[in-house]
Swiss-Prot record:
Family per record: Belongs to the Mediator complex subunit 7 family.
PANTHER family noted in UniProt: MEDIATOR OF RNA POLYMERASE II TRANSCRIPTION SUBUNIT 7
Location of region: Disordered: 1-36
A Pfam family this chain is assigned to: Med7
Main localisation: nucleus
Cellular compartments annotated: Nucleus
Polar residues bias spans: 25-35
GO cellular component: core mediator complex; mediator complex
Keywords per UniProt: Activator, Nucleus, Transcription, Transcription regulation
Protein name: Mediator of RNA polymerase II transcription subunit 7
Naturally occurring in which organism (per UniProt): Mycosarcoma maydis
Length: 315
């Protein structure tokens, strides 16, 4: 390393290095949204040898005229990495025998890595792939992605308007418990109406839609049009509308219940403290009863000993 570096070029490549450090292997691996997704393929790079190489890179001290890793492009980072790992000295040497013994336990995971000769160096950026992502960058991006879903920072619960769901209750100045009871009655009423619709005979076309005459035609032409095409029958959408209304009611109820979570936590804590107080009162009462029993027993023993001493004295 000669220490010469173009800082303007490094500033241009900083964003590229940052994106590669944050994304890691997710750019090359397809995102899995299954309930039990497989682990990311980047775990195969966490071998004993690569971790040793990473320790060497982290322990290496840069010169005063050398730029930091964040200012380098991807190519420049790899060049510096290989140059540091090829440096002679005890700090950059890896004992081959010790390494083979340590990697024997991971043979099932890293067969390909063990087959490589010890002189081969990794062809990827060790610091970008193996080090944890920079939290500051994640906060600047405003969120992070987990299994294909974006989670914002800070975690904000979206409102019903943002989710595209109609709000069926006033937003302010109303008791949430009363609103839940009202929504529950609405849900039961809509369910009863849907049940009544299902009990009716099947009518695939039960709504008559009259035709609308063309206003550009003369009255005689409009009458002729209405005579040839008076309208058509179609299916009713009442059942679908009621089902959609039930879904909206349930979502509104869930949203209200989530708003009551702090109140529920406070009431639960109050109940737990009351239960602890009652349990301690019961324990104290039990201790007092046991103490009273022991006192009575001691008094009985004293009386028995007194009687025995009187008997021995009289004899």
């Amino acid at each position: 390393m000669n220490g010469e570096y173009d800082y303007e070029d490094g500033a241009q490549h900083q964003d590229g290095a940052r994106e590669s450090a944050v994304a890691g292997a997710s750019n090359t691996n397809q995102i899995s949204t299954s309930f039990f997704p497989p682990p990311p393929q980047v775990y195969k790079k966490f071998t004993k040898r690569n971790l040793r190489y990473l320790e060497i890179l982290n322990s290496h001290k840069l010169a005063d005229d050398e730029p930091s890793w964040d200012l380098l492009s991807v190519t420049q980072r790899l060049e510096r990495q290989n140059a540091i790992l090829r440096q002679p000295g005890s700090s950059s040497k890896i004992d081959a025998e010790q390494l083979q013994d340590e990697e024997a336990d991971m043979a099932a995971i890293q067969d390909q890595d063990c087959d490589k000769p010890m002189t081969d160096l990794p062809d990827f950026d060790l610091k970008a792939e193996l080090e944890p992502p920079n939290v500051d960058w994640i906060e600047e991006d405003g969120g992070y992605t987990v299994f294909g879903q974006l989670w914002p920072i800070p975690d904000v619960t979206p409102t019903l308007q943002q989710l595209g769901i109609p709000v069926l209750y006033p937003l302010e100045g109303t008791d949430r418990k009363e609103l839940l009871l009202t929504l529950l009655r609405t849900l039961l009423q809509t369910y009863r109406e849907i049940t009544g619709d299902l009990l009716k005979p099947a009518q695939p076309y039960d709504v008559w839609v009259p035709a609308v005459p063309d206003p550009n035609l003369t009255p005689e032409q409009q009458q002729q049009q209405m005579a040839t095409n008076p309208g058509f029958w179609t299916q009713t959408t009442e059942a679908k509308d009621r089902l959609k209304h039930m879904q909206n009611v349930v979502v509104n109820m869930q949203f209200l219940i989530n708003e009551l979570r702090p109140v529920q936590a406070k009431e639960t804590l109050k109940l737990i403290m009351q239960m602890q107080l009652e349990r301690r009162k019961q324990e104290m009462q039990l201790i007092q009863e046991r103490c009273a029993t022991m006192r009575a027993r001691v008094e009985e023993l004293k009386k028995m000993l007194g009687k025995q001493s009187d008997c021995y004295g009289s004899s």
